[in-house]
């Protein structure tokens, strides 16, 4: 159970962190193009 939860957490972080980073870059680029 604990190992599975840890694995799911690590996987979630691996997915969320790069995704949020790409979203931030996309928003900055979009806002720069708009202005």
Curated annotation (Swiss-Prot):
InterPro entries: PSII_PsbM, PSII_PsbM_sf
Primary localization class, coarse: plastid
Residue stretches spanning the membrane: 5-25
Taxonomic superkingdom: Eukaryota
Record carries keyword Chloroplast: yes
Keyword Metal-binding applies: no
Keywords assigned: Chloroplast, Membrane, Photosynthesis, Photosystem II, Plastid, Reaction center, Thylakoid, Transmembrane, Transmembrane helix
A single Gene Ontology CC term: chloroplast thylakoid membrane
UniProt signal peptide: none
Task performed by this protein: One of the components of the core complex of photosystem II (PSII). PSII is a light-driven water:plastoquinone oxidoreductase that uses light energy to abstract electrons from H(2)O, generating O(2) and a proton gradient subsequently used for ATP formation. It consists of a core antenna complex that captures photons, and an electron transfer chain that converts photonic excitation into a charge separation. This subunit is found at the monomer-monomer interface.
Family from the record: Belongs to the PsbM family.
Assembly: PSII is composed of 1 copy each of membrane proteins PsbA, PsbB, PsbC, PsbD, PsbE, PsbF, PsbH, PsbI, PsbJ, PsbK, PsbL, PsbM, PsbT, PsbX, PsbY, PsbZ, Psb30/Ycf12, at least 3 peripheral proteins of the oxygen-evolving complex and a large number of cofactors. It forms dimeric complexes.
Alphabetical list of PANTHER family matching this protein: PHOTOSYSTEM II REACTION CENTER PROTEIN M (PTHR35774:SF1)
Record NCBIfam families: PS_II_psbM
Protein name, per record: Photosystem II reaction center protein M
Organism from which the protein derives: Tetradesmus obliquus (Green alga)
């Amino acid at each position: 159970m604990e190992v599975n939860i840890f694995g799911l957490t690590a996987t979630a972080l691996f997915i969320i962190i790069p995704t949020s980073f790409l979203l931030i870059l996309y928003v900055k680029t979009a806002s720069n193009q708009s202005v």
